[in-house]
């Protein structure tokens, strides 16, 4: 099994962590109106999508409920459905814009599972390509991202503005 090395994330890992606070980073972003600076890609009724500032690969994004909860148990069925619908929309937008060979989509619940923001549930969507476990991160402590976050965010916002499937009544593209 190949490993996906992401040593550039060490900056995030080693950064001082604030103790649990009333408003998580994701809640602060949700309440901000500066979507461009925060790399917010789409906002739905109960959740939003944003690019990860410390990505494992280009296009690594997260789907976050507006409600700050540590796990799925804090969401209503409607909120959970909205979260998964936006995840699907983002996967489809990434497919159209970046044409990956596959995806890792998942959730880290709890510190031992790798959660970086314990108090706020979020879903990771990580596009993958054949051979994306290259030597650059291992030998040069360098990640190769094909384009700047702002440029990629603009492309993904445009893709998310289009329905993934025009016949799907549950596709909430605006």
Regions found by a protein language model. Give the residues of each.
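Long, well-ordered alpha-helical scaffolding segments within enzyme catalytic domains
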Residues: 76-100, 150-157
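Active-site microenvironments that recognize anionic phosphate/pyrophosphate groups
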Residues: 1-58, 63-64, 170-174
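A short glycine-rich, hydrophobically flanked beta-strand micro-motif that places a catalytic Asp/Glu
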Residues: 98-111
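Short histidine-centered catalytic/ligand-binding loop motif
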Residues: 62-84, 139-145
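Histidine-centered divalent-metal-coordination microenvironment in nucleic-acid enzymes
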Residues: 60-65, 114-134
């Amino acid at each position: 099994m190949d490993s996906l090395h992401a040593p550039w994330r060490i900056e995030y890992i080693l950064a001082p962590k604030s103790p649990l606070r009333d408003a998580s980073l994701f809640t602060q972003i949700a309440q901000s109106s500066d979507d461009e600076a925060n790399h917010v890609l789409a906002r739905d009724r109960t959740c939003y999508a944003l690019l990860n500032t410390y990505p494992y690969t280009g296009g690594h994004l997260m789907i976050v409920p507006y409600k700050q909860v540590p796990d799925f148990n804090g969401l209503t069925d409607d909120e959970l459905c909205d979260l998964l619908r936006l995840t699907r929309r983002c996967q489809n937008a990434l497919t159209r814009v970046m044409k990956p060979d596959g995806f890792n989509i998942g959730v880290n619940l709890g510190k031992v599972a790798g959660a970086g923001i314990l108090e706020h549930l979020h879903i990771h969507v990580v596009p993958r390509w054949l051979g994306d476990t290259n030597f650059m991160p291992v030998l040069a402590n360098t990640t190769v991202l094909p384009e700047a976050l702002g440029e990629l965010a603009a492309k993904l916002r445009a893709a998310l503005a289009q329905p993934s499937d025009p016949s799907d009544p549950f596709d909430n593209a605006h």
